[in-house]
Amino acid sequence: MTKAVLTSISQLALKALLYEVSLSPKPGLVDRFDNGAHDDMSFMTFIDSMIALSPFFQAYIETGFAYAKEEPLLLFNRLRQLGQKAEETMFCATQGINTHKGLNFSMALLLGATGAYLARTPHLMTDLGCFSKEDTLAICRLVKSMTAHLIQTDLGHLNTKKEFTYGEQLFVTYGIKGPRGEASEGFTTLTDHALPYFRQMISQNDPETSQLRLLVYLMSIVEDGNLIHRGGIEAWKGVKADMRLLLQQDLSTTDLRLALSSYNQCLINQHLSPGGAADLLALTFYFAFLEKLL
C-alpha cells in the first residue's frame, strides 16, 4: 500500500513535467507547436529526458519517506546525491542537452519533502487526495529546513573559483540565486504567488486557459535566470513588462492564444526563453495535482 501511494505521487511529478511541455503556445519555450528559442532541443528531447528522470522521482519520494526522522541536512545530502545521478542519466538520454537540470533539483527536494511529510501524516497515506493548502505549505517548509545552509555552502565561496557553472555565473554577475534561492526560501514564489493565482484562475476558467494565464503570470513576476543569461537584465525586465500588460488586457482564450503565438516569434527573434518560469509552472502543476485542482 505504501509503495503504491508513493508511486502514484511520483507519477504526479512526471505528469507535471508532461503538462508543462505540452502546454501550447508558450513564448520562447519548447511546446507541441515548435521549439521556441531553442535550436538544440525539441518536444521529443523533453520526452526522452522525462523517461530518464522518472525512476528517480520514485527514488526521491521513497528516500524522503524512509528517512523522515533524519536531520534535514542529512536528508538533503541523500536527495542531492540521487539528484546528481539523475542528472547524469538525463544528460545521457538527451545527448548532453540540458532539458531539466534545475527542475530535477527542485523536484528532488519537493518529492523528498513530500515523502517525509507523508511519513509524519499517515492519514494522507490512507486518504490520498486530501492534500490541502496547509499541506503544501508544510512540504515547502520542510524544503526550507533542508536547504537553510545551501546559499552559503554553494555560493558563499565563489571568489576562490576560476571557472563557474551556469548558475554560479548568474549569482556572481547578477546576484541571481536560481533554484537554490527558491528552495532555501521555501518556494515562496509557489506558495505566495503561483498557487494562489492558479486556485483563483481554475475556479473561473477551463484548465487550459488557467494554465496559459498562469504561465503569463509567472513570466510577469519570476526572477528568470534563463532570460537574464540569454538577454541580460533589460531583456528580462522587458518580458516582465510585456506580460504584465498582457494580463491587464484580460483577453479571451482565443485572443490569448493568438497573443502568445505572436509573442513566441518575438522571443524567438531575440533568442530569449523564460526557462525559469517554465520550471515554476511545472512545480505549480505538481501541487495542483496534489490538491486536486487539476
UniProtKB/Swiss-Prot annotation:
Keywords assigned: ATP-binding, Nucleotide-binding, Transferase
A molecular function GO annotation: ATP binding
Pfam families, alphabetized: CitG (PF01874)
GO BP field: prosthetic group biosynthetic process
Listed EC numbers: 2.4.2.52
Taxonomy, superkingdom: Bacteria
Record's catalysed reaction(s): 3'-dephospho-CoA + ATP = 2'-(5''-triphospho-alpha-D-ribosyl)-3'-dephospho-CoA + adenine
InterPro entries: CitG, TriPribosyl-deP-CoA_syn_CitG
Family: Belongs to the CitG/MdcB family.
NCBIfam families listed in its UniProt record: citrate_citG (TIGR03125)
Name assigned to this protein: Probable 2-(5''-triphosphoribosyl)-3'-dephosphocoenzyme-A synthase
Source organism (scientific name): Streptococcus pyogenes serotype M49 (strain NZ131)
GN (gene name): citG
